[in-house]
Amino acid sequence: MSVQEITIPAPADFHVHLRQGKMSELVTPHVAEGGVSLAYVMPNLVPPITSTQQAMEYLERLRALAPQTMFVGTLYLSPDLTPAEIAKAAQNGVRGVKSYPRGVTTNSDSGIEDYETYYPIFEEMQKHDMVLNLHGELPSNADAGICVLNAEEKFLTHLFKIHGEFPKLKIVLEHATTRKAVEAVKQCGDTVGCTITPHHLELIVDDWAGKPLNFCKPVAKYPDDRQALRDVIRQGHPRFFLGSDSAPHPLANKYPSAVTHGAPGTKASASGSDHLEATGVVSCGCAAGVYTSSILVPLCATLLEAFGALDQLANYVSINGRNFYGYNDDQHAKHGSIKLRKVRSRSSISPAAATVPAVYVHPEFREVPDSDASKVQVVPFWAGKCLGWEIVRS
């Protein structure tokens, strides 16, 4: 008989974007809704979080929106950061520093170009057991033969170099998408971990080319790369764990032509354009990001079951990440376990809970036309599809 119920220790998402303003109001409560009790929050806001004070203020806003969730803060690696600020951040519970190569993803214009410049920062981080979170891609450069399909592989020399210079520094290669990245992390010592997103366990290049809702950075790669991600989860490797990279974008930014170029049946909004510019969001092209927070743990269970790794669910969504970061003994971990129940069919007890909503809309914008770019709404991954597992709520 197949497993019908699973109880797992408190899930933790070690890479999530919770944005600002109305979008943050919409998506922050979704963290708990998706089954997660600890959220490691990215700092690429506008402006980016580069100081302890900014991080504390941001975490306070998030806690006001979702008091039941444990939020862990990070800083944005930039020239503004100093060793003294690192020490201050560590004393105030900020756990990591996120590195973005310049221009490779959302709000990365302040990203870095030369890692050696930051060696004093890394040295101080090593002293305080802080974590360096690496977005592992190089910027596209046609002259150098770099594009989105090999940007991650080309980055790996930087991972090896930083790890070699600072062997005691905890490093996480974020959202790995390639077999090369998986093997690179395995080759490194115990201080190097790796997050894998659920959507990269599902998608390949065919699934995002021409399909904006599945477009993210780094992009999903080839079937063999996806197989490597699945295999390392199935193996239960202790240094690979959940980081959803759940990244909400307004629908207008996933399908920008509908608002910015006057597509048939739409009406561009001047106020909408102003809103996009004011929030630092691109007004052309497709924003990179897949949104999974609201369905995260049931989605992970569904995917892992599909490729024969359901027995590794607890390691993937809770144990491995908490062990790497040192959150395995906190009260959230001890008392935040959740139970999942198998959804037998669409006619089961709670079919609505197993069907992913088509869209989430901020309550204040429910009467705003979809054609208005200022409308705060986000389409989740697998919208309209059925999940194989649901959270049992008391």
Swiss-Prot record:
Q: In which pathway does it act?
A: Pyrimidine metabolism; UMP biosynthesis via de novo pathway; (S)-dihydroorotate from bicarbonate: step 3/3
- GO biological process: what's one of them? 'de novo' pyrimidine nucleobase biosynthetic process
Q: Which cofactor does it need?
A: Zn(2+)
Which PROSITE patterns does the annotation name?
Answer: DIHYDROOROTASE_1, DIHYDROOROTASE_2
Q: What is its EC number?
A: 3.5.2.3
Keyword Metal-binding found: yes
Provide the positions where the record notes the PTM N6-carboxylysine.
Answer: K98
Cite the binding residues for Zn(2+) 1: H15, H17, K98, D245
Gene Ontology CC terms, in alphabetical order: cytoplasm
Q: Does the keyword Hydrolase apply?
A: yes
The molecular function terms of the Gene Ontology recorded here are: dihydroorotase activity; metal ion binding
Which residue positions does the secretion signal occupy?
A: none
Q: List keywords of the entry alphabetically.
A: Hydrolase, Metal-binding, Pyrimidine biosynthesis, Zinc
State where Zn(2+) 2 binds.
K98, H135, H175
Q: Which SUPFAM superfamilies does the record match to this protein? A: Metallo-dependent hydrolases
Co-factor binding comment: Binds 2 Zn(2+) ions per subunit.
* Major enzyme class: hydrolase
Q: Which reaction does it catalyse?
A: (S)-dihydroorotate + H2O = N-carbamoyl-L-aspartate + H(+)
Into which family does the record put it? Belongs to the metallo-dependent hydrolases superfamily. DHOase family. Class II DHOase subfamily.
| This protein's name | Dihydroorotase
Ranked from the top, the taxonomy reads: Eukaryota, Fungi, Dikarya, Basidiomycota, Ustilaginomycotina
Its gene is PYR3
